[in-house]
Amino acid sequence: MSKLNSRIPAGTLDKKWTDYKSKVRLVNPANKRKLEIIVVGSGLAGGAAAASLAEMGYSVKCFCFQDSPRRAHSIAAQGGINAAKNYANDGDSVYRLFYDTVKGGDYRAREANVHRLAEISTAIIDQCVAQGVPFAREYGGLLDNRSFGGVQVSRTFYARGQTGQQLLLGAYSAMSRQIAKGNLKMYNRHEMVEVVKIDGKARGIIARNLVTGEVERHFGHAVILASGGYGNVF
């Protein structure tokens, strides 16, 4: 079994990822199409990552063991998605969203990553709206918020009781656009067997075609594991 390093940047909690982004080496736009990225999983996390990376110009391969990305378990989410937009004007902030998320996870989450998620939560909502997700709106046209379990304020964006389904369809539509443009290649009915490591870095995967049973090897300059929560995680 491969042992992977999360490589969370050093520094104070609120500046780890901000400092890292300001100092990390950039990729020349002309070279992006030469870099291959493998995304394992096509739910909300994997689908959105695959579509976004393809939009940025990278060559992306996405794997899922279902017959379609639309069958990902993310469809089961109902309540909504949290973001620190403070539309309700009740004092919400990035820190309050961070605190509620860590506490709601029984303090088991990686705090640096949760803080980064809270920082970009507003951009995630904007991305979903741009993808066509029909969030509930007030009569004036603004996105509606409601209070959800484990939070101090009303910050949950929702689409009736079908939030997961609508978010997944939005990510799927973005993926379909990139597939049509040739930037993203989808591998349905494929199961990842092992991560390939070269010099301590993930450089590909071994996958099995669930239809033919054939074992395949796929190279990637980077590998993203978005294979699901407990029970499906690699």
Where are these regions (language model features)?
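Core beta-strand elements of the Rossmann-like FAD/NAD(P) dinucleotide-binding domain
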Residues: 32-35, 211-222
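Glycine-rich loop(s) and the adjacent beta-strand/alpha-helix scaffold that form part
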Residues: 222-234
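Conserved N-terminal/central alpha/beta ligand/cofactor-binding core
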Residues: 2-20, 24, 65-203, 207-211, ...
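Short glycine-rich, flexible loops that bind phosphorylated cofactors or substrates
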Residues: 47, 214, 232-233
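N-terminal Rossmann-like FAD-binding beta1-loop-alpha1 element of flavoenzymes
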Residues: 35-62
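Short, hydrophobic/aliphatic alpha-helical segments
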Residues: 28-29, 33, 58-70
